[in-house]
Amino acid sequence: MRCPFCGSMDTRVLDSRPTLDGAAIRRRRECISCGRRFTTYERYEEAPVLVIKKDGRREKFDRNKIKNGMIKACEKRPVTYDQIEEAVNRICLKLREEGLFEVETKKIGELVMEELKKLDQVAYVRFASVYRDFREVDQFLEIVKELKREKEGEGK
C-alpha cells in the first residue's frame, strides 16, 4: 500500500479488524520510510448501483458523497470519523440488502437522516436543513420540536 504522505510503497500493517457490520476490513498501517500512520479500508467490489437524481438524471452510486455529507453535518461535533464510517457502512448495507440496481436520492437522504439522528441531533438538524431545503426559521423550529417530542416519548 502506498503511503499517502511520502508515496513510499514500504508500509506495514499494525492492526486489522472487521468493521462493526462486517462489510469491510479496517487496517492501521505505518510507513517504514517516514514513520507516519494511516488507516485503510478493504471492501468487496459491489455491483454498480445507479442513483436517480431529482431531475431524473442517473449517476453511479458513490459512498464517498454520503460520507462527505455526513462529515460536513458533523463538523465541530463530538462524532468520530469511525462513527461516521460505520454509519455509512450501515446505509450501504441497507441499500445492498434491498437488492436495487437504482435508488432515488430521497431514499439515500432519509437513510442518512436516520443515521445522523442516532449519532448527533445537531448534525441531524444541519443535514435536514440542507436536504429538505429549509427557507424559514419555522422549519428549523419544527424539526427541533419533532426531536423533543421523540425524546419525551422515549422518557415515558
Curated annotation (Swiss-Prot):
Locate the ATP-cone domain: which residues? Answer: 49-139
Q: Provide the alphabetized UniProt keywords.
A: ATP-binding, DNA-binding, Metal-binding, Nucleotide-binding, Repressor, Transcription, Transcription regulation, Zinc, Zinc-finger
Which GO molecular function terms does the record list?
A: ATP binding; DNA binding; zinc ion binding
Claim: Manganese is one of the keywords in the record:
no
Report the superkingdom from the record: Bacteria
Q: Which residues cross the membrane?
A: none
Keyword Transcription among record annotations: yes
A family per Pfam: Zn_ribbon_NrdR
> Can you say what this protein is called?
Transcriptional repressor NrdR
Q: Which organism is it from?
A: Thermotoga neapolitana (strain ATCC 49049 / DSM 4359 / NBRC 107923 / NS-E)
Its gene is nrdR
